[in-house]
Design a protein with these regions (language model features):
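Short coil turns that delineate tetratricopeptide repeat
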Residues: 54-55, 88, 126, 168, ...
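Amphipathic alpha-helical repeat scaffolds of TPR domains
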Residues: 55-62, 89-100, 126-146, 169-185, ...
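Residue at a conserved register position within TPR or TPR-like alpha-solenoid repeats
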Residues: 67, 101, 140, 181, ...
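Inter-helical turn/loop elements of alpha-helical hairpins
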Residues: 70-78, 97-132, 136-151, 184-190, ...
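Amphipathic alpha-helical segments of tetratricopeptide repeats
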Residues: 85, 122-123, 204, 234-238, ...
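TPR/TPR-like (Sel1-like) alpha-helical repeat modules
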Residues: 91, 98, 102, 110-126, ...
Length: 541
């Protein structure tokens, strides 16, 4: 059991710091007028991080660590940078500057930017063994050349385990070890459960610890665990009311449960807050990330005009932070607009690489979203040349991701390519081949967990399988495919609709009624044609 942290004997005992950033009126004015992305005036939660650095640097270290736990990396770098400005030989300030260049759960790191700070933290030889282990753990990730990202994360996990084992009552070491352990294998049930035990113990001892709550939500952002994550989602809602990612994180649980009102509410607040916290000269990745969740939620409820507003809002701005989360959202939002509304002509004509100011070459997985939508759209309208172009481009992007050792997104792109290939086969009249290809894609998808940057697939593979089986007249099998989707993604509009239609064709009237009633309840306040269809079927049967 992690108790309230007792600092090492060579440091003064003091209570955990609740990082409120309570500034004088003059300092508040200075912070408001200064450039950059400081968040010193906001509440960011409770951390317990005694160090041997000066009393003047200590509040910045605490705020920086809390922001690391919130995954607000540019803002954390600002705080740690201020600590280093106050005391340049503060090893933990340089540790923090290194860690702000490492985003473990997003699979991202700037090795060249972070390494000098990790090396400096170690070279300064901090006064305590605990701080020396923190510094060495950062260097374990950043040191060396020609090392894959996955190996770096495993090196960091091993170093964090050593730190946690040596100082088991340090909640910061424990929470960061839980993050490291989860980052190594986020889909592994054993890793999930060990991380869960650690963060639950921290949360019991420190209910406002941002890392414990945040990482617990990630632990439960997997199939079959979301129900147990609701308490953490509720705890995070009020912890840091001005931090964009804190406002967003509860929706990782709510999207798993199909609670669209909650998804919409929290991501609207997150998007608005993100505009107040730029990433230097860029619009923070947290803004388009939240908009993608908003778009997804509105479309599942059939609220097309509100969804259109999100697309227009996204396109009204430029200068997005160059990050995979931004790339994904920039591609996914317009793709969702067409695919979720079954506007196949629009999907087939999506333009890749928009906006042009964004560096798409760095993010093949983002570009793949556009080509996936284009391929599906082209297949549905019978444009075989367009389908083949999409398949070829997806194959190129898949290879590029493999060459970068980005195996997760390479596999996701493979699933997209196989799905488009299946629909091409159907368009060519090769029904059995199409079903076989789509089943292969669906089974591959079933073995992969959702990445935290997405609220859900553009169109889940089992839903695509259900659509394809419906087209082939194999209605009972289609119902099974849709129900498999709904077991993972409850309250998905088109899986509910597909199940209702396929069940009706299969003569399963009770099943059809249940799904049509569910659809009418989900989107009953909208003017979508399918809602009228549902009500008409219920009335006639």
């Amino acid at each position: 059991m992690v108790q309230q942290h007792t600092p090492p004997s060579d440091l003064p005992v003091r209570p955990p710091s609740k990082v409120l950033g309570l500034l004088s009126a003059g300092a508040l004015l200075l912070a408001a007028c200064a450039p950059g992305d400081r968040v010193a005036h906001t509440e960011v939660g409770t951390v317990d991080f005694p160090t041997s650095c000066s009393a003047e640097a200590q509040p910045e270290l605490e705020r920086g660590l809390a922001l690391l736990h919130h995954m607000m990396y540019p803002q954390a770098a600002e705080a740690f940078g201020e600590a280093a400005r106050i005391q340049d030989d503060c090893a933990m300030a340089h540790w923090g500057l290194a860690m702000a260049n490492f985003q473990p759960f997003w699979g991202s790191a700037d090795i060249e930017a972070g390494r000098p700070h990790a090396e400096r933290a170690v070279a300064l030889e901090p006064d305590t063994e605990r701080e020396r282990l923190y510094a060495r753990a950062a260097l374990a990730f950043f040191q060396g050349e020609g090392i894959s990202y996955g190996e770096r994360v495993r090196n960091w996990e091993a170093a964090m385990e050593a730190l946690h084992t040596t100082f088991p009552d340090d909640p910061e070491a424990a929470s960061l070890y839980a993050l490291a352990h989860l980052s190594v294998a986020p889909a592994d049930p054993g890793h999930q459960e060990r991380a869960n035990r650690i963060v639950r113990e921290i949360h019991e001892a420190m209910p406002e610890h941002p890392g414990a709550i945040h990482y617990a939500i990630h632990v439960h952002d997997v199939e079959a665990r979301a129900d147990d994550g609701v308490s953490f989602a509720r705890a995070y809602e009020d912890l840091a009311p001005s931090i964009p990612h804190a406002l967003h994180m509860p929706s990782h649980i709510y999207v798993r449960l199909g609670e669209w009102d909650e998804v919409i509410d929290w991501n609207r607040r997150s998007a608005d807050a993100a505009l107040e916290h730029p990433a230097g000269e860029y619009i923070s990745l947290h803004y388009p990330h939240a908009l993608d969740y908003l778009m997804y939620g509105y479309l599942q409820r059939g609220e097309d005009e509100k969804a259109r507003g999100i697309l227009e809002e996204l396109r009204s701005r430029d200068g997005y932070e160059p990050h995979l989360a931004s790339a994904y959202a920039l591609a996914a939002i317009p793709a969702r607009w067409y695919v979720e509304r079954r506007d196949w002509e629009g999907a087939a004509n999506l333009e890749p690489g928009v906006p042009e100011s964004f560096d798409w070459n760095r993010f093949p997985a983002g570009e793949a979203m556009t080509w996936f939508a284009r391929g599906l759209g082209a297949a549905r309208i019978g444009d075989l040349e367009g389908v083949s172009e999409a398949v070829d481009r997806l194959e190129t992007l898949e290879t590029a991701l493999q060459n970068r050792d980005d195996y997760y997104w390479a596999e996701q792109t493979r699933i997209q390519r196989l799905s488009v290939t299946a629909w091409r086969s159907l368009a060519e009249g090769q029904v059995e081949e199409a079903i076989q290809e789509m089943r292969e894609a669906a089974e591959l998808a079933a073995g992969m967990e959702k990445h935290p940057i997405t609220p859900g697939d553009l169109q889940p593979a089992h839903e695509l399988l259900g659509d394809l089986l419906t087209e082939a007249g194999r209605y009972a099998e289609a119902v099974e495919a849709y129900e498999r989707t709904l077991a993972t993604w409850p309250q998905r509009y088109h899986s509910i609709l597909g199940a209702a239609r396929a069940a009706a064709e299969a003569g399963q009237d009770d099943v059809s009624r249940r799904y049509y009633e569910e659809l009418a309840e989900l989107a009953g306040d909208t003017d979508r044609d399918e809602v009228a269809e549902a009500r008409g079927w219920i009335q006639a049967n």
